[in-house]
């Protein structure tokens, strides 16, 4: 049995987690602003990947990122004709979009656990909003951010439907771990080692994410 599919899934999940970390922190901070217009609507849109069937999510991503789309055309122009879909990049984006709601929710829990009096004290001492964000808010919310990244990584590692729609069954000739399990199962071959490896890895991520999340519920 080849472990290339697991390694490919690991690479995709790692890059997808980095993407969701950047966008997740920004979106979570935005949603914490109680005066944000249409805040509930934006929250609902961000959470949509949780309720959409993976194939439907993949279809929407194909429409947004495909050859006839503005984003797809811009990507091809930027990278000399390389498409975003049916490629490694498409797999990363599909995994990132699918896991983004989990990351945002965990980061928001972390932000809500930050004591407002500490923020007020920093402002009283003359710290500007940017300094407060990077020296007070984000460090205190770090366990929630880390928990979100772990959840997002576990979700990205096992993504199947959206990845299959956006990146195809093979990326440079290699399937992701989830697609490999399905292919081997349909071919009547043993998939237990790969399935067990992905399960152990995913459960470990969830275990540590849950431990970090409980810290916030006790602090909040």
Where in the sequence are the language-model features?
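Cytoplasmic-entry segments and transmembrane alpha-helices of multi-pass inner-membrane transporters
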Residues: 27-61, 119, 143
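C-terminal transmembrane helix and the adjacent membrane-cytosol boundary/short C-terminal tail
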Residues: 38, 101, 105-127, 131, ...
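Membrane-interfacial helix termini and adjacent extracytoplasmic/periplasmic loops
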Residues: 58-96, 167-171
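Interhelical loop and adjacent transmembrane-helix boundary motif
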Residues: 1-4, 163-211
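Generic alpha-helical transmembrane segments of integral inner-membrane proteins
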Residues: 14, 18-26, 52, 200-211
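Transmembrane alpha-helix signature in integral membrane proteins
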Residues: 2-33, 44, 96, 149
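Transmembrane alpha-helices
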Residues: 18, 104-107, 115, 129-160, ...
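Short hydrophobic faces within alpha-helices
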Residues: 6, 31, 48, 121-123, ...
């Amino acid at each position: 049995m080849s472990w290339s599919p697991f390694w490919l899934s690991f690479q995709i999940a790692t890059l997808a987690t980095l993407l969701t970390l950047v966008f997740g922190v920004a979106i979570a901070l935005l949603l914490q602003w109680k005066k944000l217009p249409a805040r509930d609507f934006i929250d609902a849109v961000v959470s949509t990947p949780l309720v959409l069937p993976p194939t439907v999510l993949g279809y929407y991503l194909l429409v947004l990122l495909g050859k006839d789309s503005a984003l797809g055309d811009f990507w091809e122009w930027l990278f000399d004709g390389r498409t975003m879909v049916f490629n490694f990049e498409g797999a990363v984006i599909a995994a990132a979009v699918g896991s983004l709601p989990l990351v945002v929710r965990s980061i928001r829990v972390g932000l809500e656990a930050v004591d407002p009096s500490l923020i007020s004290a920093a402002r009283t001492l003359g710290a500007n909003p940017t300094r407060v964000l990077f020296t007070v808010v984000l460090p205190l919310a770090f366990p929630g951010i880390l928990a979100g990244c772990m959840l997002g990584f576990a979700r990205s590692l096992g993504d199947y439907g959206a990845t299959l729609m956006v990146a195809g069954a093979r990326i440079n000739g290699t399937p992701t771990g989830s697609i490999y399990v399905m292919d081997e199962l349909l071919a009547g071959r043993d998939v237990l080692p790969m399935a067990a490896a992905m399960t152990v890895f995913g459960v470990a991520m969830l275990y540590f994410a849950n431990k970090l999340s409980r810290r916030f519920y006790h602090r909040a």
